[in-house]
Amino acid sequence: MKTTIHCGDLRGGAENIWNAGMAERIEKVISDYIEAEKPLPEAAQECEISLTFAGEAQMAEINKEYRETEGPTDVLSFAMWENEEGAFEPPADWDSLPLGDIIVCPEVVAKNAEENGKSAESEMVLVICHGFLHLIGFDHAEEEERAAMWERQERMVKEFFGE
């Protein structure tokens, strides 16, 4: 499975926790996850994710528009293949599958990292893994769903850092 992350920055080249080396490593982690867990249809040989960095004001606007929640958040995901019930339902016969968009606010990620006693890089990897899991149908509205999602994202973060 080949995973490609297309990166964009709405902040005009502001400082970022993210770098090209991280992109390659997270693509591998996501590819490994897909190979092991098989969440995509058999026909899918590659997948694509759009990753965009937004400033706090931009993220607050997006959060308000789509979640009706005030203020910025660390990560938002917009799944391409979510059906009306919220389940992941991609086309079964596509060999290349765009999964959707992940929008990250590095400033909020850095604040959360400091509050949680983590490195900014570790927190960035965590929110991107979290966003990816939303793209393939995971949610955390219920405790059981939350536990399953958190276990997977923590496993992916550990793989990223070689733990």
Q: What is each of the regions a protein language model found here?
A:
Residues 1-125, 133-163:
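An acidic/histidine-cluster motif and surrounding catalytic segment
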